[in-house]
Amino acid sequence: MRINRTIFFILITFSILVGLQAIAAESHTINAEARRFVADIVHIQVGDSVAWINMTSHNTVSIDGMIPEGAEPWRSDMGENYQLTLNVEGVYAYVCEPHLGFGMVGLIVVGEPTNLEKVREVASKLVGPYRRIIGKLKKVSAPK
């Protein structure tokens, strides 16, 4: 009987902790304006969500080599609002493909920017309007 109580207590404790983590997760909004994302740099915690809204003539696409190792790349449908939960710590760079030439790029920093140097290295080799991401990377501090 004592074993059943112990197992029950462990299960209840685990359920509460999982529930608290879900409650603590936040949703952050990125607004797609005519030719820019507002906010263009977002700092969030692991497990938080990002929602892109007002995507009438926009999409959001992660940039190859500029997301953390083990993270899933994404490509939203054109004209559709999009939501993504990020569970891997690091820097994520993304663009709006139709408006890339206008500098419509953004960064999401999840927890500590553990892959910042790798992302900066990839950014240094970008050409054309993709290079606009470099200015945004200068605003991100290296992990402590």
Q: Residue ranges of each PLM-predicted region?
A:
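Bacterial N-terminal signal peptides that target proteins for export
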Residues: 1-9
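Extracytoplasmic copper-binding redox domains, predominantly the cupredoxin/blue-copper superfamily
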Residues: 19-144
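Bacterial N-terminal signal peptides
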Residues: 9-18
